[in-house]
């Protein structure tokens, strides 16, 4: 959030979009959706060593309290409708993080029952590669999501998230 013009000791001016984006970036509440071994690394990221709370990132168990979903692990075709339902229950704006090679591209499982990347079903905002990715990689991906949120131009008064905005532009 940049300072456009100082008015004195106790005042600064900025755009409303910058203020709203700063608040959104500073309070990401991800819904954890651990499907395989990447979930272990996601739990390690949430431990005290990395301290996600200092970035305003607090894991939530309910989709109605979350604004981000982390898909971690292998997505099967049988699990895909459940993931879509959870995604639809999240309030706007909402973001999707694909964690691990399986969530990003299907990984080593090139079979009929595995979805070859969650981006075929949901609009992914951040991809975190690796098998499994280290906790530092997930932390870096969440910080990149914060950067992406800060660059959002139409957040105030808008009822759509970044992923849906990208879909409607295509």
Swiss-Prot record:
One CC-aspect GO term: plasma membrane
Presence of keyword Translocase: yes
Keyword rRNA-binding part of the UniProt annotation: no
Record field: catalytic activity: a quinone + NADH + 5 H(+)(in) = a quinol + NAD(+) + 4 H(+)(out)
Matches recorded under Pfam families: Oxidored_q6
Cofactor note: Binds 1 [4Fe-4S] cluster.
GO molecular function: 4 iron, 4 sulfur cluster binding; iron ion binding; NADH dehydrogenase (ubiquinone) activity; NADH:ubiquinone reductase (non-electrogenic) activity; quinone binding
Annotated PROSITE patterns: COMPLEX1_20K
Binding-site list for [4Fe-4S] cluster: 37-38, 102, 131
Keywords for the protein's UniProt record, in alphabetical order: 4Fe-4S, Cell inner membrane, Cell membrane, Iron, Iron-sulfur, Membrane, Metal-binding, NAD, Quinone, Translocase, Transport, Ubiquinone
Membrane topology (UniProt): Peripheral membrane protein
Entry EC number(s): 7.1.1.-
Location relative to the cell: Cell inner membrane
EC top class, as a word: translocase
Source taxon at top rank: Bacteria
Cofactor field: [4Fe-4S] cluster
Subunit text: NDH-1 is composed of 14 different subunits. Subunits NuoB, C, D, E, F, and G constitute the peripheral sector of the complex.
Family listed: Belongs to the complex I 20 kDa subunit family.
UniProt cross-references to NCBIfam families, sorted A to Z: nuoB_fam (TIGR01957), PRK06411.1 (NF005012)
Protein name, as recorded: NADH-quinone oxidoreductase subunit B
